[in-house]
From Swiss-Prot:
Zn(2+) 2 binds at residues 188, 191, 209, 213. One of its GO terms (cellular component) is nucleus. Its EC number is 2.1.1.-. Residues 1-101, 442-521 are annotated as: Disordered. InterPro entries: H3K4_H4K5_MeTrfase, SET_dom, SET_dom_sf, Znf_MYND. GO terms for biological process: methylation. This is SET and MYND domain-containing protein DDB_G0292140.
Length: 521
């Protein structure tokens, strides 16, 4: 790879030189270029200024023939020297072409992305297994805390519960003081389902939100839970991204898989790549569609589930926009998001880890397989959408790189239950295999669920309450008059009389027995 184009927040384009050594990594966030690697505009301006200020006439040059290559050079110079007022003549074009060595601009990857080129940027490589699918391995020995990957999501959505405090475009969380007294947060006036931290973010995201706004407007948030509403928003957000790519392709009149797209990309497109697709990371819908959805592992009852009816409802709403979609295709998208989405945590407060701001589907991060003893951890960079993956331990060349999908502190049966329910596989990692040899009470098999413990505790409390009620009732009876008007003293006297009567009855019965015995004798 000859170079990587960066688009920092100040809207300046920096071209970082790449190294010829494939073993060295080139991070996405690069340092500003040195003096020898300047921008194209700076070089063109410096050359033009030198040519005009020079008093010595240039050496005679052969008159260039008006070929196609000359016209191409003229177009490139005019495009890359937008800040130079004078018009460059043909003679100067020839001199500029000879003196300026334009850096080669690496085109953004088109579909399908070549994941085999990752070793030129990051020390990882993608392999495929017939059963386990694609997975990542280290291409060399790496130390702990080494950054092995940074990634942006293909699709993302803000949680419905935080849509009034998290920007839909950049995922910036509004400070707490502005959440109480909002001043600079812009909610969409059409649907009131998404908001933005600035007018610039709202303007950039409009190219995609214009598709989903009409659908969000039709959704009744009171009919769905916040979790389900967030899932619907991610589904619609993925659809709108797909429609945006289709509209760009139709407007350009070219096939997105056509090789000619590489020739028609201009420098201005890389100068502001967000003008076409928000948060463009070079991925397209075909790359997203290759992710696993596990739809084949679901039974026929899925067609009667709520997810299927949600997809049918979204299909009807899409038809109002002139977009023809199939229920089964939308079901694939919904299940694909469930299997591959990463929750994006918010800013920690009061010692907590922070609530979820939303979720996103990171295509490259989805290649990490699960392990209950992972060697890679990931987190969000500076309250944005970018995710950084670092090593938790030293790894050797060829070792598989894994992350954890669940809480690994849970016992064995709880971990496997979570993975089977959410990801439809039974974990056989080294930690799970080792835990199988533990006693049953340590694997969690004999442990009672929290709900069972709560029920048992409530039952014990009820028994204690009943005992207390019995004691209180007895005390109340002693302190109150009886229904016949007798007091406690009279009650005691009656009890004594009853005891005496019982004794007399017993004596009479004994005397009767003696008489019977005498008769028999």
């Amino acid at each position: 790879m000859d170079g990587v184009i960066e688009s920092p927040s100040n809207n300046t384009i920096k071209i970082s030189p790449s190294t010829s050594d494939s073993s060295t990594t080139t991070p996405i966030i690069t340092t500003p270029p040195t003096q020898s690697t300047a921008t194209v505009t700076t070089k063109a301006a410096a050359t033009t200024t030198t040519t005009e200020a020079s008093t010595t006439p240039p050496p005679p040059q052969p008159t260039p023939t008006p070929t196609q290559s000359t016209a191409t050079v003229t177009k490139e110079v005019e495009t890359t020297t937008e800040t130079i007022p004078p018009i460059v003549t043909k003679g100067k074009i020839k001199k500029s072409k000879k003196s300026i060595k334009k850096p080669t601009i690496v085109k953004r990857p088109t579909t399908p992305i070549d994941y085999k080129q990752w070793h030129t940027e990051w020390p990882i490589h993608v392999y495929s297994h017939p059963i386990n699918g694609r997975y990542l391995v280290a291409t060399k020995d790496l130390d702990e805390q080494t950054v092995i990957l940074r990634d942006l999501p293909y699709t993302w959505a803000v949680d419905h519960a935080t849509c009034d405090s998290v920007c839909q475009h950049c995922f910036l969380e509004v400070p707490l003081n502005q959440q109480i007294l909002p001043t600079d947060f812009y909610m969409c006036e059409g649907c009131q389902r998404v908001g933005y931290c600035s007018a610039n973010c709202r303007c950039i995201d409009y190219s995609q939100h214009r598709f989903e706004c009409q659908i969000f407007k039709e959704l009744d948030t009171e009919e769905y839970s916040p979790f389900l509403m967030s899932e619907i928003k991610l589904l619609v957000r993925t659809l709108s991204r797909k429609w945006l790519e289709d509209s760009i392709t139709q407007t350009a009149g070219i096939d997105i898989n056509d090789e000619t797209i590489k020739k028609q990309n201009t420098y201005n497109q890389y100068k502001n790549p967000q003008s076409l697709i928000p948060q463009d990371n070079g991925l397209r819908y075909n790359d997203y569609a290759e992710l696993v959805s596990n739809v084949e592992n679901y039974n026929e009852s899925l067609k009667e589930s709520l997810s299927y009816w949600i997809c049918k409802y979204v299909v009807k709403l899409s038809a109002k926009l002139g977009k023809i979609e199939d229920e089964f295709d939308l079901l694939n998208i919904l299940l694909r998001n469930r299997c591959n989405a990463f929750y994006i945590q918010g800013r920690p407060r009061d010692g907590s880890s922070g609530e979820s701001r939303g979720c996103g589907v990171y295509v490259r991060n989805s290649f990490f397989n699960h392990s209950c003893d992972p060697n890679v951890n990931y987190w969000v960079v500076n309250n944005t959408l970018e995710v950084e993956c670092t090593l938790l331990k030293n790894v050797k060349e060829g070792d598989e790189l894994t992350i954890s999908y669940i809480d690994t502190t849970s016992p064995l049966n709880k971990r496997r239950e979570k993975l089977l329910e959410g990801y439809l596989f039974n974990c056989l990692c080294t930690k799970c295999v080792a835990d199988e040899s533990l006693p049953l009470d340590q694997t969690g098999t004999l442990e009672k669920d929290d709900d069972d413990n709560d029920d048992e505790k409530e039952k014990m409390d009820e028994d204690d309450d009943e005992k207390d009620d019995d004691i209180n009732n007895k005390n109340d009876k002693k302190s109150k008059y009886k229904s016949d008007g007798s007091t406690d003293d009279e009650e005691d006297e009656d009890n004594n009389n009853n005891k005496n009567n019982n004794k007399n009855k017993n004596n009479n019965s004994n005397n009767q027995d003696h008489q019977n015995n005498d008769k028999s004798n």
